[in-house]
Amino acid sequence: MQAEYGDKVEFIVVYIREAHALDGASPRGVGGDHPIVEEPLTIDERLTVAKRCDAKLDLTPFTVVIDDIEDTANTSYAAHPDRLYLVDKEGRVGYAGGRGPREFFPNELEDAIREELGLEPIEHEEEEEDRGFPARRRPR
């Protein structure tokens, strides 16, 4: 999506608290392949962990910002563990996706982006079932 719409839409990754911190409730997550880090206690620690995440996932095409240590963005947007949002040209939430991974549907975000940009809707290829969760399409 960033390659398709990045010249018209700014894609921002907000690094929030750790979903699978070693000292958290779910240190290994579902797949057990998450990096082992403790929950940062200071903004400098969070910045260090966020930089490692940025490098590991190669988030180069995106603007990456970090939530403050009080988790203001995370709390305000119910972002944990991950969410997709579209903020429209007036600064209002134009799309709020469900909580990931079970309610994480990028096609819905693309539909909302296209609508915001005044582009014709597109038909999405049927998504394969991914991560063991059934594919879903936004009702028209």
Where are these regions (language model features)?
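Thiol-/selenol-based redox modules, centered on thioredoxin-like
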Residues: 68-140
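Structural microenvironment flanking redox-active thiols in thiol-disulfide oxidoreductases
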Residues: 1-57
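Beta-propeller folds
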Residues: 3, 55-61, 110, 122-123
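Short N-terminal micro-motifs specific to bacterial/archaeal maturation
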Residues: 37, 41, 64, 100-103
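Hydrophobic/aromatic beta-strand patches that form the interior of the parallel beta-sheet core
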Residues: 12-14, 65, 85
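Gly/Pro-rich cap/lid or specificity-loop segments adjacent to the active site
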Residues: 40, 44, 62, 69-72
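Loop/turn elements at helix/coil->beta-strand transitions in domains of secreted/extracellular proteins
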Residues: 6-10, 58-62, 81-82, 89
